[in-house]
């Protein structure tokens, strides 16, 4: 990660190769490999890795999805992204919720399939519905249309920026960024993102996103 941050793709790939030989490959190395492919302009490979991470490792959606969106924007292939997200969200409601949450906290806008996931997130989050005074009656879903979804997204994004987004499953240490080594319990890759935006003392957290 240090190597790729310094723009040394070859050195980063060398470390990844060493990890393969030692059989210590982790999802962390997958993320680094995807970044290397992106910097090397091997966009097809980078997209494949990010898609695999999203499909197989729900807790890293918060890291992989923004990068995937950025790639498709660069390549002007947002329709391909829309098709991919639609297939995922239709086949897995929990994954759709996790995608919606990721879209909110990363302030991703103007992509129809992701907007649908955000709407689904709002409609199916019981705590958020209670906060917005929306009942479980499906007819009351129409109330969401009278509330600016964009305004809700902006408010939740601002709130997410000021609260912890990740928590260690081992000791409970919380942080804004994904930390591979927990500074509290010294365990590797034990942090997971929360699956909803924190409302401080007004609302409570729901469980972490995990595999």
Put a short name on every predicted segment:
Residues 1, 11, 27-28, 62-63, ...:
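Start-of-helix register in tetratricopeptide repeats
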Residues 65-69, 98-105, 130-136:
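Amphipathic alpha-helical elements of HEAT/ARM-like alpha-solenoid repeat scaffolds that form extended
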Residues 9-20, 43-55, 77-92, 110-125, ...:
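Alpha-helical repeat scaffolds
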Residues 3, 37, 71-72, 104-108, ...:
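Residue at a conserved register position within TPR or TPR-like alpha-solenoid repeats
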Residues 57, 65, 71-75:
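Non-catalytic protein-protein interaction scaffold segments in large eukaryotic complex-forming proteins
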Residues 122-211:
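Cys/His-clustered metal-coordination modules, chiefly Zn-binding fingers
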């Amino acid at each position: 990660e240090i190597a790729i941050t310094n723009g040394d793709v070859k050195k980063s790939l060398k470390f990844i190769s060493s990890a393969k030989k030692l059989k210590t490959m982790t999802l962390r190395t997958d993320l680094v490999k995807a970044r290397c492919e992106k910097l090397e302009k091997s966009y097809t490979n980078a997209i494949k890795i990010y898609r695999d991470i999203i499909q197989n490792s729900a807790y890293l959606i918060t890291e992989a999805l923004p990068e995937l969106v950025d790639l498709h924007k660069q390549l002007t292939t947002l329709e391909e992204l829309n098709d991919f997200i639609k297939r995922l969200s239709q086949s897995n409601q929990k994954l759709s919720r996790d995608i919606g949450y990721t879209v909110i906290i990363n302030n991703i806008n103007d992509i129809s399939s992701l907007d649908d996931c955000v709407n689904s997130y709002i409609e199916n989050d019981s705590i958020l519905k209670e906060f917005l005074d929306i009942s479980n009656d499906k007819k009351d879903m129409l109330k969401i249309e009278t509330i600016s979804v964009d305004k809700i997204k902006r408010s939740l994004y601002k709130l997410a920026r000021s609260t912890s987004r990740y928590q260690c499953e081992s000791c409970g240490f919380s942080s804004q960024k994904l930390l591979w080594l927990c500074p509290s319990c010294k365990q590797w890759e034990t942090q997971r993102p929360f699956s909803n935006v924190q409302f401080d003392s007004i609302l409570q957290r729901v469980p972490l996103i995990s595999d």
